[in-house]
Amino acid sequence: MIQISNEDNMELMKRYPDNYFELAIVDPEYGIGADKPSRKPNKCKQSNGTVLNVKSPNYTHKNWDSKPADSRYFDELKRVSKNQIIWGVNYYDYNLTGGRIIWDKLNDSSDQFDCEIAYNSLNKRTDIVRYMWRGMFQGLSITKNAHKALIQQGNKSKNEKRIHPTQKPVKLYEWLLINYAKEGDKILDTHLGSGSIAIACHNLKFDLTACELDKDYFDAAMLRLRIHQMQKTLF
């Protein structure tokens, strides 16, 4: 079952007892101004050699990323979940001692961040996964193999559509669930954003409880999820 609400995450979490969720997979505020992305054009070279000028998504500027998530949030998150995967660990002034997951976005030749780092309470090692995620340049598969990760999705119409400035790909969440969650685990996401995790949980049949405070993002994510669910039903 997927349960998603339009509310503050602290209000959601306070309704649950200690250790209710087996795994929280969250992407809180980093405090780096990601709510006001620049609107610069990109160039995309097709597999047939054609170069396209691609406009960046015209995201509405908002005010949710002026400061990173605080200790009150992390204390509550750790109370309600047995284990956590927390993106943006390098931005937080909070003791998150444990493993790390590094997502290599294969952005070496761009001005975008080369990778993103997550805290992983399930172990103390560092795991690296590679998936191309740079505008129109999206990977065909998510893998630890650097050579395979460089293969692009050739048909750009199959690319994942962006609806949120910090959107993470569905394939990344599927990889996290396959590698770190167990069958029957209850999953928590306190910052739904684009809803990618909801699609991944739907595909892999995990129960998800999630919330999104921003009404615009909430509505867009719910529409995205409903369309995906209808398409899966049809095919």
Predicted regions located by residue number:
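Extreme N-terminal starter segment of soluble prokaryotic enzymes
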Residues: M1-I4
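Conserved SAM/SAH-binding loop
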Residues: N6-E11
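Class I S-adenosyl-L-methionine
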Residues: K14-V26, Y30-K62, R72, K78-F235
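Nucleic-acid-processing active sites and adjacent nucleic-acid-binding tracks
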Residues: N63-K67
